[in-house]
């Protein structure tokens, strides 16, 4: 990353959630989850500016309460990527890159954001984080997207299926010992002109098959660079996730 590259980090946050309504406002160690995420992002030196993108009065009020910056967005966005683009447009200030940080990962580490920022150069269109898979449960879990990369670190394909298939090893228990598999971590960096383009694309066949929005970009010919992190990411999707992580950290 060039030292003069400017980056705005946008944290999309919705109150409505099928599995965990209101989760941005849940308390974790004395702070709301959205403040936990905001504080972690703000402490990353490479980030020029941080803001929350939300369609909810309660989340907006909470961000203003702890002194954060917030942009109101429309409620009907199909993805965090679309919400980020609207927020960036309303910011009305140019940046070299936008990083989309998930609003339900209160334990995101600044080092992970630094790792992603570290591969950003003017010729990068899109970028994301990946991590080596260490256990069989993750390897074969369809809720954990896997990724294949080429020799230049660009994503070839993302899938909920375990990829690649090791034909020479019929016993899948041998797979981790014989190949390095990577999982995708859903933090994205976009060049602004590319973000404007990908939000105009229609859903693609592969995206609909796998339910992974990044496949739309690959199918349309965009390049997604990857950065490898060694840090595990813990997202909170359900009340059970919250109980597990707070119990572990206490």
Swiss-Prot record:
What subcellular locations does the record give? Cytoplasm
Key word Transferase present? yes
Class of this enzyme? transferase
* EC annotation from Swiss-Prot or TrEMBL: 2.7.7.38
Q: Could you state one GO cellular component term attached to this entry?
A: cytosol
Q: Name one GO molecular function term.
A: 3-deoxy-manno-octulosonate cytidylyltransferase activity
Per its record, the protein catalyses: 3-deoxy-alpha-D-manno-oct-2-ulosonate + CTP = CMP-3-deoxy-beta-D-manno-octulosonate + diphosphate
- State the pathway, as annotated in the record: Nucleotide-sugar biosynthesis; CMP-3-deoxy-D-manno-octulosonate biosynthesis; CMP-3-deoxy-D-manno-octulosonate from 3-deoxy-D-manno-octulosonate and CTP: step 1/1; Bacterial outer membrane biogenesis; lipopolysaccharide biosynthesis
**Biological process annotations from GO:** CMP-keto-3-deoxy-D-manno-octulosonic acid biosynthetic process; lipopolysaccharide biosynthetic process
Tell me the superkingdom of the source: Bacteria
Q: Which UniProt keywords apply?
A: Cytoplasm, Lipopolysaccharide biosynthesis, Nucleotidyltransferase, Transferase
Q: Which SUPFAM superfamilies does the annotation name?
A: Nucleotide-diphospho-sugar transferases
The entry's function note states: Activates KDO (a required 8-carbon sugar) for incorporation into bacterial lipopolysaccharide in Gram-negative bacteria.
Q: Which HAMAP family match?
A: KdsB (MF_00057)
Name by which UniProt lists this protein:
3-deoxy-manno-octulosonate cytidylyltransferase
